[in-house]
Amino acid sequence: MSASEFLRKEHEEIMRLEKLVTKCSKSLYDGKDIPLSHIDKINFLIAEFLDSIHFTREEGSYFPCVASYDHLNQEIRALLIEHELSRNIAKQISENLKQWKKGLNKREPVARFLRTYSIFLIDHMQKEEQFFEKAEKEILSKEEEQEMLEQFQSISAIAEKVTSLLEDIDYLEEQDWAK
């Protein structure tokens, strides 16, 4: 397995989360009750899995390695801007969810920002897949791919965290509103 393949595998798990985000948003728009603790868990997964783990791997290792060849820099810049957009949408979900938990009716904004996040994820994952393809074919050596993969896998605490986060996705997928 290469670093590119590893990130692609994470994308598969992220798309499981995207399906949950979509179903949650649709259920909220349809007036169905979803426990706020479940929406909290989705919000936590966005913050931890996407931002703290996946985006950090890309921003800390993968993108700098590709950029060191002074190639695909515009694509990297666009993806970094999109990562920031992701953080901003997630912040809106979080802020509206906090207000909802305090008793304000924030169902619609939470549903809207979840829907926005879902649309973002689908588009962003496709762009990253195309980027990985180019980087893999045109730039990165097998040695660089292997070195980054070892870096991704080296911190066992992160591997344990990912396992825990995937269990959270499993749990949410089993909820009535997610089926």
Region spans (language model):
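Small-residue-biased structural context
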Residues: M1-K179
